[in-house]
Design a protein with these regions (language model features):
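Extended, compositionally biased non-globular segments that define protein topology
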Residues: 2-122
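N-terminal secretory/membrane-targeting segments
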Residues: 95-241
Length: 241
């Protein structure tokens, strides 16, 4: 092989590598911060509602799929908000606020009723207000100021931060891709055998233990599927009319 051949090869390949770098860099610049922030939000959720965080962390280390099933919904929500708003800080902040509120609600319900947060609880606004009235006025005041301050930060992030320029087709493809991924992943969250395959810390029939062992996010989404009413085999609606 002559010395000229490697040089010619490099001359041919370098332009292609530059094109690839130009394509990948914007994607990585967006994907990597969202990826790490999704893990950070998941860690925050686990820290808020897990009584034995080290045991949950041990489960995550032994079963990486369990960690992925808790992180992926956070990442998908961030991506969806990012493609809609075109603002990364706003998307991360709103996602963190939503999942943190979910974790706080689960922690309060678990401590007061020994039951985890269920999808049906989202419709019980009156009951939630009744529970809030049992808290001291100072706690409610601090919580209200905290929520208002957080909302102001979100509004500032939405209005002041410069949004990334997306072509309309690119935004639609991004939103469609996120929704498609969510639809496909839902088969994993609906799977009872998969849910039962992960170990439970303590009594396996106690739902609070299931949430503490598998993570709030995964367990909540599994319950959202498990609580759906299904028609029995051979059921004919006309026969009961």
């Amino acid at each position: 092989m002559s010395e000229q051949e490697p040089r010619n090869f490099l001359r041919r390949i370098l332009p292609e590598l530059k094109k690839l770098a130009k394509t990948l860099f914007p994607f990585l610049r967006t994907a990597l911060p969202l990826f790490f922030c999704a893990h950070a939000v998941t860690t925050l959720v686990c820290a808020i509602n897990a009584d034995h965080l080290y045991l949950l962390a041990e489960n995550f280390l032994q079963h990486p799929l369990l960690l992925a099933l808790n992180v992926l919904p956070v990442l998908l929500v961030m991506l969806l908000l990012y493609y809609i708003s075109r603002r990364m800080v706003f998307s991360i902040g709103l996602t963190a606020g939503l999942f943190a509120a979910m974790a706080i609600a689960d922690s309060i319900k678990s401590s007061m009723r020994q039951e985890p947060l269920l999808p049906t609880d989202l419709t019980l606004a009156k009951e939630a207000l009744a529970i809030l009235k049992t808290f001291p006025d100072f706690t409610l005041l601090v919580g209200a100021f905290g929520i208002i301050f957080f909302l102001l930060l979100l509004i500032l992030a939405l209005l002041l931060a410069k949004g990334r320029e997306f072509a309309p087709k690119a935004r639609l493809k991004g939103i469609g891709g996120v929704l498609l991924c969510a639809l496909l992943l839902n088969f994993c969250y609906a799977s009872q055998p998969l849910y039962d395959s992960f170990p439970t810390i303590g009594n396996p029939n106690f739902q609070v233990n299931q949430y503490a062992s598998r993570g709030l996010i995964y367990s909540f989404l599994h319950q959202a599927n498990a609580m759906q009413v299904k028609k029995p085999n051979g059921y004919i609606a006309d026969a009961f009319e």
